[in-house]
Amino acid sequence: MRATVLAVGFALSLTGSALCAPITFTTILSGANESPANASPGHGSATVTYDPATHLMRVEVSFGDLIGNTTASHIHCCTAVPGAGNAGVATQTPTFTGFPLGVTSGTYDHTFDMSLLASYNLAFVTAHGGSLSDSEAALAAGLESGQSYLNVHSSSFPSGEIRGFLTDSGPVPEPAGLALLGSAIGTAVGLWRRRVA
């Protein structure tokens, strides 16, 4: 019995990351999603993957057909109600590091360390007591509750030409960890049966 408990305990310790898996948020970017809405033919999509265990947040954006040239892009948080309204900028200002500026179409892919002050708008950190951990928790809560949106600003629409509220598309699957857990449980059951027999 002791071997069974140890085997299951060991397997659970190896799959701890599966219990705190990265979470993926996605959105469709459009002028109709702005507040107030605009008639821009611009369109795009964004994926934000946040890993609470490593404090890393990957931002992937693709956009095209903007009327104006890009001037900035960032994540705003947290609106009063999910999926509606406006909020201040949560991530770094004036724009994401390396975001393509002065263009009407492009792609972007960057990973931020959310345990660093440089990943945030200082006003967002100040609003959360000056604490990085509280700021990270607030942004994570805003993402999970649908109260955060990614905005692409342009010369024609300084308040934002296209945006979209980020919605949870579920944790990133970690099949290796789950397979290991299944294997350990199978081994534990086999040991238990042999011992009982």
Give the predicted meaning of each segment:
Residues A21-S73, C77-P171:
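Metal-centered catalytic cores of metalloenzymes
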Residues R194-A197:
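Short, charged juxtamembrane terminal tails flanking transmembrane helices
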Residues P173-L191:
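A short, hydrophobic C-terminal helix/tail in secreted or cell-surface proteins
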Residues A7-T15:
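Bacterial N-terminal signal peptides
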Residues S17-L19:
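Bacterial Sec-dependent signal peptides at the C-terminal "C-region" and cleavage site
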